[in-house]
Amino acid sequence: MAMDLLRHRLGRIDYLPAYEAMQVFTAARTPETPDELWICEHPPVYTQGLAGKAEHVFNPGTIPVVQTNRGGQVTYHGPGQVVAYPLLDLKRAGYFIKEYVYRIEEAVIRTLVEFGVTGHRVAGAPGIYVRLDDPGSHALLPQRPMKSGLANPSFGGLGKIAALGLKVSRNCTYHGVALNVAMDLEPYTRINPCGYAGLQTVDLSTIGVCAGWDEVAELLGDKLTRYLAP
């Protein structure tokens, strides 16, 4: 089923105005408001989720730190990263937050497939990961999702390539997903990404994929439109 999802390419915009615009849009929407998908990239910024702890940001330097109302802990946004914000009415879509997370992750996985990369889920740690030794490997991870209930997720041999942070208000979503394309990854060394010490962050460039921001943004937008459809 095709989804009536209005897609907007916002280019490079500061994080705070985008965050404020999402809040305004969500607060003002009615049951008839069309769903939207905002795609952009941000200048360097750290964002803290509701579970964020100050000790996970140990050397921000000149990069601003913005407290947000999304789930999760600290992450980094910067040039060379595709950020997608689906603004959906989940009640109208007909599924709940757990399935929504799964669908976003599936859209990222399907985007990576287009570049010969296999994305993996890790139980208890939303986001998408790749094997550092063989990014195209389809072999099942020992951290596979079927092994649920792990108190301390294992990231051995993995690099995180996409991060999720979401908020649902009155059954309507905002915030979203960030997929790393070709970034300066050094700012990740100044934080514990998503609250995990030692978690390695990668981008497509790091694992040998040469892809432009526009190409990845278009593909991710297409996949999100498809996999978020009712």
UniProtKB/Swiss-Prot annotation:
Report the superkingdom from the record.
Answer: Bacteria
List, alphabetically, the GO terms of the cellular component aspect.
Answer: cytoplasm
**Lineage, highest ranks first:** Bacteria, Pseudomonadati, Pseudomonadota, Betaproteobacteria, Burkholderiales
Q: What else is known?
A: In the reaction, the free carboxyl group of octanoic acid is attached via an amide linkage to the epsilon-amino group of a specific lysine residue of lipoyl domains of lipoate-dependent enzymes.
Q: BPL/LPL catalytic domain spans which residues?
A: 31-230
The site annotation (Lowers pKa of active site Cys) covers: 160
- Assigned protein family: Belongs to the LipB family.
Substrates-to-products reaction catalysed = octanoyl-[ACP] + L-lysyl-[protein] = N(6)-octanoyl-L-lysyl-[protein] + holo-[ACP] + H(+)
GO BP term, example: protein modification process
- What's the protein name? Octanoyltransferase
Origin species, per record, is: Albidiferax ferrireducens (strain ATCC BAA-621 / DSM 15236 / T118)
Tell me which residues this entry annotates as catalytic.
194 (acyl-thioester intermediate)
Q: In which pathway does it act?
A: Protein modification; protein lipoylation via endogenous pathway; protein N(6)-(lipoyl)lysine from octanoyl-[acyl-carrier-protein]: step 1/2
According to the UniProt record, what class of enzyme is this? Answer: transferase
Keywords linked to the UniProt accession: Acyltransferase, Cytoplasm, Transferase
What GO molecular function annotation could you give as one example from this UniProt entry? Answer: lipoyl(octanoyl) transferase activity
Subcellular localization(s) per the UniProt record: Cytoplasm
Q: What does this protein do?
A: Catalyzes the transfer of endogenously produced octanoic acid from octanoyl-acyl-carrier-protein onto the lipoyl domains of lipoate-dependent enzymes. Lipoyl-ACP can also act as a substrate although octanoyl-ACP is likely to be the physiological substrate.
Q: What is its EC number?
A: 2.3.1.181
Annotated substrate binding sites: 70-77, 163-165, 176-178
